């Protein structure tokens, strides 16, 4: 859950230093791009690249180079991986994939060059492999999505038996990379290197996935990256030495060590929970509320454009690792409820991050990424989201236009409408998968009680059910969190002692009962007066 956002300030010299670090991650072009890579795909044990256009080189040949996520330019390199074959107005390349070896090209992006003055000069756009799923050995399809069940919850494994009682089809669980890399006991060899993951964490995750699957729930893993001395190489270098102490950090794919460890970890998860005896995971969310970078995905104090481009590289590594094992897995980015609003510094508006991320993905090859977002009430403690909280009216934070500052359950359609634009469509031409990976309402605090919480869940779910582009919601949470209760938030369907609140029974029945008895809390007699069922 997002915390209180504090406005960040920094000195000019510090900003320049961070920008310098990030600029090293941007691709460098030494010539005009007169060649366009149209396709980059796996076929058998080869990577095939097809390009159009032409460029003048010293020898009339075209040379293909592979760049790892942590590499930014061809520079002085001479190790091209293929020579192009012009045919019928196009240029074709073929180079080995080297799957599951130290030379693997699974995470490479490719660029066409020509010889000039003894160097190889890029003359094309860059493109990653577009179909990593071509080598997948499994496919864990979502049963709940197929049946139209949108109900999910941020689960708590001691109460796993309640998932089927609630009728939820999705269960969310958070996975912290640092916890798995600290300690060992479970070995995994990937691309020629052996990694040892914390046996206790792995076995606990085995148990959680199996328990949730046994309750007929699809599992959604939220991947986060905390700091520890043993995993400092997985933390974005721009976030180190800043004196900040966020909950989670941006993943480091700017160095070989960081990128390879992240790829191996995501491969490990996707391979392990791929429908075998250890269970299956259908969805992965890469990072939590990444636009709230200062708290949840810290990369340093950098402009949003640089942040979004770097996040796209992290996502691409995770996506290719996951899809190369599980062709049916859904992989999501994650933003909070702030759309245009930001608190300055490294706290960005969600729309700006989405725009920058999408631009970078389109630049380097469109893939089937999805969006998860968190349309909480404004503020978080104001559970009756259908009203404006005292003192918030003059701020005008919520409206039903693309210029809204915040997204709540009342204007979720702003997001789904935005994603129907041509530039945001999936490679298939359809609207991308959109989910809500966190949403909750407190039963305590000013103006709140257990009936208000129950009404908020009923109303918000009916709005979600009426939106055909939202595939699922994870309500947060199953149980009141004692720490959050001290902060004035009691979002659980159960209280901290495990006793059901009215919200429990409402969520249990919300997809099969009118629940009109809760409509008066929002100012109507029946939900049909709001056009809802």
Placement of each model-derived feature along the sequence:
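Bacterial N-terminal signal peptides that target proteins for export
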Residues: 4-14
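Aromatic-rich peripheral "rim/lid" segments of glycoside hydrolase catalytic domains that contact
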Residues: 242-244, 274, 290, 295, ...
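Sec-dependent signal peptide cleavage junction
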Residues: 24-32
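Noncatalytic carbohydrate-binding groove/subsite architecture in carbohydrate-active enzymes
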Residues: 262, 277-282, 306-447
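Bacterial N-terminal signal peptides
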Residues: 14-25
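Structural preference for beta-strand elements that scaffold enzyme active sites
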Residues: 150-152, 169-172, 216-220, 281-285, ...
């Amino acid at each position: 859950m997002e915390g209180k956002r504090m406005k960040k300030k920094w000195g000019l010299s510090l900003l320049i230093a961070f920008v310098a670090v990030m600029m090293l991650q941007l691709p460098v072009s030494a010539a005009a791009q007169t060649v366009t890579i149209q396709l980059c795909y796996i076929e058998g044990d080869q990577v095939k690249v097809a390009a159009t256009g032409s460029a003048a080189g010293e020898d009339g040949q075209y040379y293909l180079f592979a760049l790892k996520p942590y590499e930014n330019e061809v520079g002085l390199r001479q190790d091209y991986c293929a020579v192009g074959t012009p045919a019928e107005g196009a240029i074709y390349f073929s180079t080995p994939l080297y799957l599951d070896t130290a030379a693997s090209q699974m995470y490479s992006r490719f660029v066409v060059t020509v010889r000039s003055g003894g160097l190889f000069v890029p003359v094309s756009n860059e493109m990653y492999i577009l179909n990593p799923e071509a080598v997948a050995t499994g496919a864990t399809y979502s049963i709940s999505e197929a049946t139209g069940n949108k109900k999910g919850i941020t689960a708590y494994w001691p109460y796993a038996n309640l998932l089927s009682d609630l009728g939820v089809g999705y269960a969310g669980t958070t996975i912290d990379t640092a916890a798995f890399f600290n300690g060992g006991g479970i070995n995994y060899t990937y691309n020629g290197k052996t990694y040892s993951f914390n046996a206790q964490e792995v076995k606990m995750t085995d148990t959680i996935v199996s328990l949730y699957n046994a309750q007929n729930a699809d599992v959604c893993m939220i991947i986060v990256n905390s700091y520890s001395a043993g995993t400092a190489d997985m933390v974005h270098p721009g976030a180190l030495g800043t004196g900040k102490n966020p909950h989670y950090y941006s993943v480091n794919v700017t160095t070989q060590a960081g990128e390879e460890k992240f790829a191996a970890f995501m491969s490990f998860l996707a391979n392990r929970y791929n429908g075998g005896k250890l269970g299956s995971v259908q969805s992965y969310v890469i990072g939590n509320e990444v636009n709230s970078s200062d708290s949840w995905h810290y990369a340093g104090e950098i402009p949003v454009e640089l942040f979004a481009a770097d996040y796209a590289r992290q996502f691409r590594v995770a996506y290719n690792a996951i899809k190369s094992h599980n062709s049916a897995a859904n992989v999501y980015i994650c933003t909070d409820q702030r759309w245009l609003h930001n608190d300055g510094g490294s706290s960005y508006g969600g729309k700006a991050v989405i725009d920058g991320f999408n631009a970078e993905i389109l630049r380097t090859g469109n893939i089937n990424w999805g969006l998860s977002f968190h349309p909480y009430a404004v503020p978080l403690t104001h559970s009756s989201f259908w009203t404006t909280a005292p003192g918030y009216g003059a701020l005008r934070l919520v409206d039903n236009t693309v210029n809204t500052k915040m997204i709540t359950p009342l204007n979720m359609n702003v997001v789904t409408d935005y994603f129907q634009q041509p530039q945001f469509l999936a490679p298939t031409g359809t609207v991308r998968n959109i989910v809500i990976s966190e949403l909750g309402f407190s039963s305590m605090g000013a103006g709140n009680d257990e009936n208000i919480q129950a009404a908020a869940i009923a109303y918000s779910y009916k709005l979600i059910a009426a939106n055909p582009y939202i595939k699922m919601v994870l309500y947060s949470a199953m149980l009141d969190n004692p720490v959050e209760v001290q902060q004035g938030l009691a979002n659980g369907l159960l209280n901290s002692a495990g006793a059901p609140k009215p919200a429990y029974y409402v969520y249990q029945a919300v997809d099969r009962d009118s629940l009109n008895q809760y409509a008066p809390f929002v100012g109507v007699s029946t939900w049909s007066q709001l056009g809802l069922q």
